[in-house]
Amino acid sequence: MKNPISISYLRNKFLEGIITRLCKYLPASDIGRLFERVQIDFAGEDPRIGAYALEYNNPQALCFLIDAYPTLRRLFNEYPRMSDIRLIDIGPAFGAAGGLLAQMHRSHFLGPKLRVDALDIVADRKNFIEMSYPMISFLHSRIEDISPDKTWDIAYCSNVIEHLDNPQNFLRLLLERIHGYAVLLAPYMEEKPLSLDHKVRINEATFEGFPIISFEKLTTPAWPPTADGVARQQALIVLRGTARSKV
């Protein structure tokens, strides 16, 4: 016997039909502006959160991704062209980086197809991310609460570890869930006083004892000089995952 169609499913399909039909009566530009207003509403009760996401956080996240993409691309090329890569974006903020990766690699046109998960401890990001980037699956969890049996091929982690009291413990837990590589960005040797919510300075010593593939320093518009004119750099690090291969 087939499972009965739920009332919520029928309701959602009915509403989708109404919204789609109504949108046909609006100019395309009005629909775009309406979508941005809905994004802001979904980002949190305070509209300033959504405005911050669209005007500042997402542009910064995309700029960091542009900096890291050549490295990610080289790693993607190690996989068969027609394969699927499981990628997790950890600490995705409002999802712009993972969303763009999912859109770019939604098929095998550019090589391996990506299946993107986004993991964050902030539950309020879920609605904004899943509405803005529907190809992403959002996971509300800490890395230590993810089953060791749940693994990914590649991790992308931009400007997260400097917010942690113990980044080494986080890195160990992360690598145990990654078969391929972890690509990380973080402020390099940030001058004191550290930026808001930053807890540690990141340098080469942070990664001692870990399987480092590469460590480079870069300058990026996403991490500009301070108000006092002090130049700042980002570190771009690639680590090898330590997850056990599935038999």
PLM region descriptions:
Residues 1-150, 158, 171, 197-209, ...:
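Conserved N-terminal segment of class I S-adenosyl-L-methionine
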Residues 85, 153, 180:
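Conserved acidic residues
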Residues 93, 162, 189:
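Active-site beta-alpha loop architecture of Rossmann-like, nucleotide-cofactor-dependent enzymes
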Residues 154-165:
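A short SAM/SAH-binding and catalytic strip from SAM-dependent methyltransferases
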Residues 164-174:
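A short, conserved alpha-helix within the catalytic core of class I
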Residues 179-189:
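Conserved beta-strand signature within the Rossmann-like core of class I S-adenosyl-L-methionine
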Residues 190-195:
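A short acidic, helix-capping loop that chelates divalent metal ions and anchors anionic groups
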